[in-house]
Amino acid sequence: MQYNILMIEKVPRREVKEYFLLANAGKRFFKENLGKNELEDRYHERLGEFDNMDEKDLDEKFKDKTRLRRYNEMEWYGDNKRLNEMGSWPEMKGLPIEFTTGNVPETARMIDRFKREEIEVSKESLEKTRRCAKKLDSIIRHIDFVKPNFPLILFPGGEVREKDYNRHARKNELPLCKIFGYDIDDGSERAVSYSLAGLSDAPVYFGEYSAKD
């Protein structure tokens, strides 16, 4: 089954899990230098495999049990969201934290300035930042395939950037991440690539905690 996100609609939790696992599997597709038709075939093959699995079997594929708990505790919806409403994972792919304290377009601008040699990074971060920039360029080259087929997965703003990063950062006097409407759980690189390519929104799944009585 393939899902098309055209408007806000409630979606089953397992659908979000399938697409998280599919995005992880998809990283290998691009390492294999497949042509467009082969990419499509591999994509639908893996999606079909996940679609035919029981949800408990999908759950077993999640290595991060905190992520799985969050997926299970939230209600999920499909929509298109603006990139300026999202913050990436702090220090995504080893970037300096200063690159990821702002929203997605701000992170994209920092990457662009780095590529233009307008800003420098520490020796410890240099190689990781170069690798990240190359990966973003690769996503842009395949953007027509990636964007419609791999929705971003979003948590409520602060779920990662505040709870998992800022609380620790305050104690250690580190730079803090700004909090926006959504934190990206899966797809930070894709989102930044879209912004670098001049796009302003993306298809997403976003989670919300159920209102408590």
Predicted regions and their residues:
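Basic- and aromatic-enriched surface patches that contact anionic nucleotides/nucleic acids
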Residues: 4-54, 58, 62, 170, ...
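Short alpha-helix boundary/capping and kink motifs at helix termini
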Residues: 32, 41, 46, 54-183, ...
